[in-house]
């Protein structure tokens, strides 16, 4: 199943070597204005679920890095436009 229909990607965890793609993961662009709030909600849910403290802390540091990045670039309202619409909503071209 294509979880992320907007992006094709291959990501490798440099510590454990696990590989992730658009089949089992998703991408949030750091420039998107909604990302800090989305990460804060994720962090809160991780706390509720009992994730280990290091994971909670790493999310907090990620939120700070995203905010710092956004302060140095033109952050934008996220969008899905043009040909992305048919792919993201209807799964065309998968």
Language-model segments: which ranges?
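Short intrinsically disordered terminal tails
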Residues: 1, 71-94
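Amphipathic alpha-helical packing elements
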Residues: 25-71
């Amino acid at each position: 199943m294509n979880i992320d229909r907007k992006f094709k990607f291959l990501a490798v965890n440099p510590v454990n070597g696990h590989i992730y793609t658009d089949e089992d993961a998703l991408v949030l662009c750091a420039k998107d204005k909604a990302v800090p709030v989305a990460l804060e909600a994720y962090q809160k849910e991780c706390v509720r679920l009992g994730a280990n403290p290091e994971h909670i802390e790493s999310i907090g540091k990620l939120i700070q890095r995203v905010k710092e990045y956004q302060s140095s670039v033109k952050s934008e309202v996220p969008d899905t436009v043009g040909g992305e619409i048919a792919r993201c909503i209807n799964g065309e071209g998968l």
